[in-house]
Amino acid sequence: LKAWASLEYGQPHPRPLTMADASGGETMDDRASEPLPEALLIDWLRIPTDRRMGALFEAFRRGYSIEDVRDVSGGVTRWFLHRFEKMAALETEIRAAGELGMKAADIPIGEMRRWKGAGFTDLHIADALAGFPTSGFKSLPKDSDEDAVMRRRHELEIHPRFRMVDSCAAEFAAVTPYYYATYEGGSAPTGIDHVPGLENFTKQRIVVVGSGPIRIGQGIEFDYGCVHAVGAIRDLGHEAIIINNNPETVSTDFDTSDRLYFDPLTLEHSAEVLLREKAHGILLQFGGQTAINLALPLAGRLPHLEGMGLNLAMQGTTPDAVDEASDRERFEEFAKRVGLRMPNGRTASTPEEVREAVQEIGYPVLIRPSYVLGGRGMEILSNNRQLDAYMEEAYLSPERPLLVDEYLGNAMELDVDAVCDGTEVLIGAIMEHLEEAGIHSGDSTCFIPPQNISKKILAQVEDWTKKIGIQLGIKGCFNIQYAIRGETLYVLEVNPRGSRTFPFVAKATGVPLARIAARLTLGEKLAE
């Protein structure tokens, strides 16, 4: 967030900060909509962490004055506080409009321009109109609400302008294909800001969604996959466009792609880039969980975007297959159908369901959210006291359930990286973890080839991996995590995307797995 905010993209303030915040995964409107106790709010204001911006908004919502916030926060500059106070007042205006019955379809053009120009995302506007509904546990706004705001904005022909980054700080003229989106304080012209000369372009334009900021759960390894995917796209004679919001990675170097967009990796920002480019294809499986999480929402938006002239193919594994691999209940059905063994587990959407699942499975349990980065929120719980503490922090909704699994103690864990063209599977490597199962793969040491696995289990791993790739219809890369207890093999999870071990596998084996996977997503076969 600091690296992004320091670039000062977008205007007026605090637009650069809101863009930076939207780039961090958990946003201001996410954090600030929680029913915070007063003491916790004071702590969030006082201690300089990524929670502070959300706390600033909440303080102004509760009627704090600028001097109150300045005193509690230890001296945040008044210049910034005035702007956050203004945004909080504008958010209150949106909320009041919702209380008076305004729906997304009713938003006037003037208000839409002002709200977008101030830095509010479509999701934040939808949430504010709904009054930030909470019910003890965090309640997320429905995607349909955000979709309604986007449709109204497009109906009003309000789109961001894309500005080129001056990479030479005005010392001399420099033309670099770096862009960022801005609504310029609400005065944005109407209509889609297409790439200049787009009608003369002859090559297909393929967009690669990057992995975003490097943080716990999302490392630089995913950027490796994005860079090699771009190389494969260009080798095939297409234009490669990257959307990424991390200025310190290789994928955002000036000569990596044909065009680069420094924008948050959200559905709203990605859709605007796709419209600007009139993109022919998009690759989501190389940017880790951040990118693959866009698969289902983007698939839901495609009919609307196609109505605006976009003829986009979601390259590689289908969004439905991504959901089948990622959704616990669907994958359990898949595992039974294919003949795979999984630890005993349940999906829970309410606190009551979580406790019922734990009682049914018995301690110890492994509990984690679905669709998250790098094991965020994953815990091994051994008693009711630990469960109570975990539930105080849990975010639950039907859209974001918790996965409760039997914990396999004294088990060995394996990682498998592979690629598939839909009919044939190439296994890049089978990696044995040094630590026992339950240590997240991002924190574990692994080695190639495995040293402590019987030939029988090794053959079963290869067989199950091929079954999973072909039966799921994977096109591109995928990663499977297995556990072995005694001579019994279990599937822990399947990730229909590149993994953090891809660079290790490629360098250890000499097989450019990411580049091969990219070519498969674009329609080539392994036999080729």
Annotate each language-model stretch with its function.
Residues 111-114, 123-131, 137-194:
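C-terminal amphipathic alpha-helical interaction region
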Residues 1-93, 97-110, 115-119, 143-144, ...:
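ATP-dependent carboxylate activation and anion-phosphoryl transfer catalytic cores
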Residues 308-378:
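A conserved helix-loop-beta module that forms one wall/lid of the active-site cleft
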